[in-house]
C-alpha cells in the first residue's frame, strides 16, 4: 500500500516574498515546529552559489552552509532538503549531509 508524504516548502517558496530573509531564529522555529507537527519532508530553501552565505536567509551557496542552521536543533523524524534551480549551483558545491 502506498503512503502519502507531506512536504513543506515555506522556507523556499516563501522566500520569493522576502528575498529569503526570514532571520535565523524564525528559520530554526519553522523547522522545529514543522518537525514536531510530523511533516515528513522539510525544504529548507534554495542552493544558489551566486549568493553569499547569510545565516538569516534560506538561500545558501552550498550544502556546507546548511550545518549552522541545525546547531540548535535536534531533528529526528523529517527529511531535510533544499532545491537547486538548474545552473545556479555546481555539483562541487554539494556534499553529503547528515
Outline where the language-model segments fall.
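Active-site beta->alpha loop and helix N-cap motifs at the rims of alpha/beta catalytic domains
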Residues: 35, 41, 46-98
